[in-house]
Amino acid sequence: MEEEVAALVIDNGSGMCKAGFAGDDAPRAVFPSIVGRPRHHGIMIGMGQKDSYVGDEAQSKRGILTLRYPIEHGVVTNWDDMEKIWHHTFYNELRVAPEEHPVLLTEAPINPKSNREKMTQIVFETFNAPAFYVSIQAVLSLYASGRTTGIVLDSGDGVTHVVPIYEGFALPHAISRVDMAGRDLTDYLMKILAERGYTFSTTAEREIVRDIKEKLCYVALDFEQEIQTASQSSSLEKSYELPDGQVITIGNERFRAPEALFQPSVLGLESGGIHVTTFNSIMKCDVDVRKDLYGNIVMSGGTTMYPGISDRMQKEITALAPSSMKVKIIAPPERKYSVWIGGSILASLSTFQQMWISKQEYDESGPSIVHRKCF
């Protein structure tokens, strides 16, 4: 045992899978969490066609495939496809033998118990890993920011969670989940671009809209004011070149799409905005910890990457909080990957090494051991 074996860290998101080695400062592999199967069998004679494609390859061949996302709203719903994604991660992306490395996976807050057991079972029985651990995504984001107490707003492609954490433990009674995230904002942007006369309808065109969203959208500090500015001048307009060379211009759509985070009613959703959800989660916590939560509001996930989101959040929470309360929003520049980074930090700590569930423990106790060792 001269050479320390690096643990594998895999953060399975609804939209993207992030994977790499513990101790690294960024994931080595980032690819779409998609499994594609041919729509028609046997039309591609001589192509040596596979019965399924994963990630970027599925994305690039999407014309002939039916695409499925095995993770919906942050929770695994299709285990066969999930297994394919993990297989692809180990063998094609990281090029490692999973039976030689401890594996750390991430899970959504309030993940069903049966899901954690199934995950544990697949890692040990299908991939024969020597050791395994599962960690809550928001908690890892908090670790990545160098804290153990705070409230994490984690918003990715499929789901948004608000998770208050005290001394490293998530407070389950105060966790909120909102089924509104990046994918919904992309769909909404598609809808409001159609009102301008630009129609995007296929799944391939949806990817273009996602790119427009990532490159041009931002959050307005004062929505009404911004709408006024946009109607009076063209200073907020930007142009975007489509793959076919056509150039389109977008104006108030740039901030109208992300505004849905603060006003979900525009999507026809009942829930309050992310600021209200955060405030409500804080109010569900013990009065003694609230000050620590207000002072450590940590943003994480790709949907928190919009320019202007921290300032807007600061303004909205300050308006809701008691007047003397110090409100601080932490938005690390690498927050798109902070769940993965937190996992990398955790799995490389010397104090963490006795926390792993070993293959031996699994063989003795079965999948339910995960509830005793990972919390």
Swiss-Prot record:
Catalysed conversion reaction: ATP + H2O = ADP + phosphate + H(+)
Signal peptide positions (record): none
InterPro entries (UniProt xref): Actin, Actin/actin-like_CS, Actin_CS, ATPase_NBD
GO MF annotation: an example: ATP binding
Protein name: Actin, gamma
Entry GO terms, CC: actin cytoskeleton; cytoplasm; hyphal tip
UniProt keyword list: ATP-binding, Cytoplasm, Cytoskeleton, Hydrolase, Nucleotide-binding
Known function: Actins are highly conserved proteins that are involved in various types of cell motility and are ubiquitously expressed in all eukaryotic cells.
Subcellular location(s) per record: Cytoplasm, Cytoskeleton
CDD domains noted in UniProt: ASKHA_NBD_actin
Source lineage: Eukaryota, Fungi, Dikarya, Ascomycota, Pezizomycotina
